[in-house]
Amino acid sequence: MVEPNLIFYDTETTGTDINFSQIIQCGSVLTDAQLNIEDEQNIGSSPLPWVIPHPKAMLTNKKINSFKSNTSHYQMIKEIYDQWQSWSTNQPSIFVTYNGHRFDEELIRRQFWYNLFEPYVTNTNQNGRLDLMLMMHNIASFFYDKFTIPNFEDGPALSLKLEHICLVHGLSLIHI
């Protein structure tokens, strides 16, 4: 059996409500099963004219410069779709997010659909999906003695924030 490629991705959006948000940036990295980076894509666009960005989203993602982008939303979505298709057509791929199934994944699907692209790229044609945060919940519950999960603000609660997990394991988290 062929080992699947891994496609890690994250989006930045104009809002916090999936029904009123637009993707303004998407970063994707293609790796082999041993996590060797084979290709990457980082693309953004300006907000659509009728989308009003939510201040909380703009404070979180700090993508104010996207307002000056000459890339249209359609062009960005088409390039994401084309890239993901090219990465996953000849070899099955697993699309990996961190806390992305409820928001990023659904928003990607909706925006593929709005722009007349097949919305289910991430789970058809032998492709699959993985939300690492859901996996971290299982690890924290059942394998807490095998993998260090940091505490939240030195309290009894655990922190599953990606930056906290990376910090405790000596991994760098690059924000673009």
Predicted regions and their residues:
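Short alpha-helix plus adjacent loop in nuclease-associated cores
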Residues: R129-E153
